[in-house]
Amino acid sequence: MSRRCELTAKGVQTGHKVSHSNIKTKRRFLPNLVNVTFLSDALGRPVRLRVSTNALKSVDHRGGLDAFLLKASVAELSPKAAELKRAIAKKKAAEPAAAAS
């Protein structure tokens, strides 16, 4: 399992730990990742993703997982999240057609 957010593609960064005497030592900055189960309104089922806490705020701000995925670009999403986006878009496109009939 990689240390990368499935929604925002936030990953590991590298840098230096700097001592008082300005000696630099390589270190890694790990993203704050959590395993979360989101409820998809369009799909009507729970979806389990590994996301950063920053992505949790973004999903909440945009009004849920469905709205976040529909606005996000496919380039920054994981393959699993991109597949979810396609499924949600397909369901949303089928809803108005079913209501019109």
Curated annotation (Swiss-Prot):
NCBIfam families: L28 (TIGR00009). It comes from the Bacteria. Keywords: Ribonucleoprotein, Ribosomal protein. Transmembrane segments: none annotated. This is Large ribosomal subunit protein bL28. InterPro entries: Ribosomal_bL28, Ribosomal_bL28/bL31-like_sf, Ribosomal_bL28_bact-type, Ribosomal_bL28_sf. One of its GO terms (cellular component) is cytosolic large ribosomal subunit. The keyword Ribosomal protein applies. Gene3D superfamilies: Ribosomal protein L28/L24 (2.30.170.40). GO terms for biological process: translation. Belongs to the bacterial ribosomal protein bL28 family. One of its GO terms (molecular function) is structural constituent of ribosome. It comes from Rhodopseudomonas palustris (strain HaA2).
